[in-house]
Amino acid sequence: MVNARDTLISLPFSAASGPGVEWRITDSYVAYEDALAAMEARAAAIADGTAPELVWLLEHPPLYTSGTSAKASDLIEARFPVFPSGRGGQFTYHGPGQRVVYLMLDLKHRRPDVRAYVANLEELIITTLAAFNVRGERREDRVGVWVKRPDKGDGYEDKIAAIGVRLKRWVSMHGIAINVEPELSHFAGIVPCGIEDSRYGVTSLADLGLPVTMHDVDIALRQAFEQVFGEVHGVADQMAETTN
């Protein structure tokens, strides 16, 4: 069966023109409050035309974030700090071993279509996972990217990557989180994305038996980004940057 969102990625999502996309990788853990403030400031500058678009790859220390649809009952145990994020969605976990990708893209100059943007984020994840022979799939009734788990039983699937976005003046914020090798037990403090069905769990590349490094994922992400969203260039060729 063809997912309705599959049809949304058929049109180009690249920018018609502009100074290019900055590609930034931060090696140290970034406090959530600092990341949120930096995102807000950069998104405003992009909207004002004073800064290029930015794709920021990072890791957070262990924490939970709540989206605009989060229910208090889905916070089972606040094992780690909880932050309101302003993005769509419900509760999620971020922590070491998870590649968080914050995308600040000017959709006004790309394609001002929220549903198409989310579909392209899904495609970014699916293409990245394919580099490691992992078949990620989108689901019409569940946000994120999923992998089938026949080893767990008929109809079982695990989420391997989460998606949460916010738009302000048609500039995107937040983005995706791919589970490379996080501590999966940390997800037990919440009902991830409000999904209570026991057939649907959480997995990672390591959990699937793949010895993939964060650097491997970063290379695959950049290749996938250029395929889905267009070339990064200019200051984007700084493949690694450490910020404090």
From Swiss-Prot:
One of its GO terms (cellular component) is cytoplasm. It is an enzyme of class 2 (transferase). It comes from the Bacteria. Residues 49-233 form the BPL/LPL catalytic domain. It is found in: Cytoplasm. Keywords: Acyltransferase, Cytoplasm, Transferase. Its EC number is 2.3.1.181. The active site is at C193. Pathway: Protein modification; protein lipoylation via endogenous pathway; protein N(6)-(lipoyl)lysine from octanoyl-[acyl-carrier-protein]: step 1/2. GO terms for molecular function: lipoyl(octanoyl) transferase activity. It catalyses: octanoyl-[ACP] + L-lysyl-[protein] = N(6)-octanoyl-L-lysyl-[protein] + holo-[ACP] + H(+). One of its GO terms (biological process) is protein modification process. Substrate binds at R87, G88, G89, Q90, F91, T92, Y93, H94, A162, I163, G164, G175, I176, A177. The record marks K159 as: Lowers pKa of active site Cys. HAMAP family: LipB. Belongs to the LipB family. Catalyzes the transfer of endogenously produced octanoic acid from octanoyl-acyl-carrier-protein onto the lipoyl domains of lipoate-dependent enzymes. Lipoyl-ACP can also act as a substrate although octanoyl-ACP is likely to be the physiological substrate. NCBIfam families: lipB, PRK14341.1, PRK14345.1. In the reaction, the free carboxyl group of octanoic acid is attached via an amide linkage to the epsilon-amino group of a specific lysine residue of lipoyl domains of lipoate-dependent enzymes. This is Octanoyltransferase. It comes from Afipia carboxidovorans (strain ATCC 49405 / DSM 1227 / KCTC 32145 / OM5) (Oligotropha carboxidovorans). The lineage of its organism: Bacteria, Pseudomonadati, Pseudomonadota, Alphaproteobacteria, Hyphomicrobiales.
